[in-house]
């Protein structure tokens, strides 16, 4: 499918640089596929759900994956910025660095901003391998929990490029760029639909009879990568590690058998649920990497409703929502959102999408 079909123009003023306050005051565009677009706010979410429905949230926790350092292995030093994108083992990470041209295999980087050190001393890493587009393999001097603590001491929240390009990260982002469900460290980008939730909203959802289930998908930096090919068939999707427990699978299957709907909070929860779903729609336990790439024509097995933010043009995530609710429907919804001043991307507003009626699997 041609990728230019998923392109649109977004005025810069529609890009949110800070989240709404309180979080549930963010706007929410309800898209049911009946041709009517309804402007609401996130606090209204319980009104659109029924007793027995199950919300599925991602409990991944964003690590302080943005590191500043200096190349110290040559006569002249060079400033280096690194974003950790994937843990390889106890002491090695895959990272994106800039300027990549100043690094070669064997170089040593000493991390710490303006002379700052962690409790254990300097955090040094050796460039073990170098790939394309600034990608390197870093081997750190620390291992396991000691390395985790050093990264936490020295790192900063890895804000998306469309925010970081307009302002530096600050202490407020450490709280803002983390969901209330965050529990399991490993993400280098937030599952942003979850940012809209507050304890008060969760309480109202439970009072409505809506269940809440947790899954884990460690969001990688690949979520921000553009689709550079002209046809979706040529795009290679990034892999992310996810986990869905047997208990959660059983709860979701039981709820669906009783007529409840599965509501994915975010595209990360959606991708994990669809990865775990069997051909008949049964959700199975899952613990592995997934590189599922959802485009129009995909037959959804697990998810009935999707709550998500507004995504980048020509991105895999806009392709996903177009597959779920229909390309023409989403083109109209996004045009309405832009005209109406909705705020886009990670800190922006939400939309609540109902699956195209002919897409739900009828179980035997």
From Swiss-Prot:
Its main location: cytoplasm. One of its GO terms (cellular component) is cytoplasm. One of its GO terms (molecular function) is S-adenosylmethionine:tRNA ribosyltransferase-isomerase activity. Keywords: Cytoplasm, Queuosine biosynthesis, S-adenosyl-L-methionine, Transferase. It is found in: Cytoplasm. Pathway: tRNA modification; tRNA-queuosine biosynthesis. Its EC number is 2.4.99.17. Coiled coil: none annotated. It catalyses: 7-aminomethyl-7-carbaguanosine(34) in tRNA + S-adenosyl-L-methionine = epoxyqueuosine(34) in tRNA + adenine + L-methionine + 2 H(+). GO terms for biological process: queuosine biosynthetic process; tRNA wobble guanine modification. Transfers and isomerizes the ribose moiety from AdoMet to the 7-aminomethyl group of 7-deazaguanine (preQ1-tRNA) to give epoxyqueuosine (oQ-tRNA). NCBIfam families: PRK00147.1, queA. Monomer. Belongs to the QueA family. This is S-adenosylmethionine:tRNA ribosyltransferase-isomerase. It comes from Bradyrhizobium sp. (strain BTAi1 / ATCC BAA-1182).
């Amino acid at each position: 499918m041609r990728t230019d079909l998923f392109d649109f123009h977004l005025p810069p003023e529609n890009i949110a640089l800070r989240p709404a306050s309180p979080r549930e005051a963010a706007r929410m565009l309800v898209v049911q596929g009946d041709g009517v677009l309804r402007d609401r706010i996130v606090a209204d979410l319980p009104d659109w759900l029924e007793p027995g429905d199950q919300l599925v949230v991602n409990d991944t926790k964003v690590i302080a994956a943005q590191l500043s350092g200096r190349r110290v292995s040559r006569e002249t030093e060079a400033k280096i910025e690194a974003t950790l994108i994937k843990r390889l083992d106890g002491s090695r990470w895959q990272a994106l660095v800039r300027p990549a041209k100043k690094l070669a295999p064997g170089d040593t980087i000493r991390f710490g901003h303006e002379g700052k050190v962690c409790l254990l001393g300097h955090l040094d890493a050796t460039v073990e391998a170098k790939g394309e587009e600034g990608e390197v393999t870093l081997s750190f001097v620390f291992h396991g929990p000691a390395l985790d603590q050093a990264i936490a001491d020295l790192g900063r929240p890895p804000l998306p490029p469309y925010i970081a390009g307009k302002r530096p990260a600050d202490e407020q982002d450490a709280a803002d760029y983390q969901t209330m469900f965050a529990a399991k460290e490993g993400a280098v980008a937030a599952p942003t639909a979850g940012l809209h939730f507050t304890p008060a909203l969760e309480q109202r959802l439970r009072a409505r009879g809506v269940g809440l289930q947790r899954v884990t998908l460690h969001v990688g930096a690949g979520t921000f990568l553009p689709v550079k090919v002209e046809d979706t068939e040529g795009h290679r999707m990034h892999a992310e590690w996810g986990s869905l427990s047997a208990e959660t699978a059983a709860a979701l299957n039981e709820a669906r058998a009783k007529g409840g709907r599965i509501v994915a909070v975010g595209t990360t929860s959606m991708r994990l649920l669809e990865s775990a779903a069997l051909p008949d729609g049964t959700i199975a336990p899952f613990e592995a990497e997934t590189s599922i790439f959802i485009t129009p024509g995909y037959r959804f097995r697990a998810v009935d409703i999707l709550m998500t933010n507004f995504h980048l043009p020509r991105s895999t995530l806009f392709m996903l929502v177009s597959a779920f609710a229909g390309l023409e429907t989403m083109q109209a919804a996004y045009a309405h959102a832009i005209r109406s001043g909705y705020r886009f991307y990670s800190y922006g507003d939400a939309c609540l999408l109902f699956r195209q009626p002919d897409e739900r699997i009828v179980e035997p």
